[in-house]
Amino acid sequence: MARTNKLLTPGVEQFLDQYKYEIAQEFGVTLGSDTAARSNGSVGGEITKRLVQQAQAHLSGSTQK
């Protein structure tokens, strides 16, 4: 199945890659094709969780003007 996720902000891919490796390092996971899907998935899940928290904090802060 083709990947249809499009990044809307130019340059964000580099940021996300760096974020991914930082979180993997925190978890003690070495990312790569030889790593278990469960380990790689835990990193992806944590990225999503943190990005959602940051977005919620940003939105709640911007609406309290």
From Swiss-Prot:
UniProt GO BP: DNA topological change; sporulation resulting in formation of a cellular spore
Keywords assigned by UniProt, alphabetized: DNA-binding, Sporulation
Protein's UniProt keywords contain Cell membrane: no
Site (described: Cleavage): E22, I23
Family matches, as Gene3D superfamilies: Small, acid-soluble spore protein, alpha/beta type-like
Keyword NADP annotated: no
GO molecular function: double-stranded DNA binding
InterPro entries in the cross-refs: SASP_alpha/beta-type (IPR001448), SASP_alpha/beta-type_CS (IPR018126), SASP_DNA-binding (IPR050847), SASP_sf_alpha/beta (IPR038300)
Record-linked Pfam families: SASP
More about this protein: SASP are degraded in the first minutes of spore germination and provide amino acids for both new protein synthesis and metabolism.
Role description: SASP are bound to spore DNA. They are double-stranded DNA-binding proteins that cause DNA to change to an a-like conformation. They protect the DNA backbone from chemical and enzymatic cleavage and are thus involved in dormant spore's high resistance to UV light.
Family designation: Belongs to the alpha/beta-type SASP family.
Protein name, UniProt field: Small, acid-soluble spore protein C3
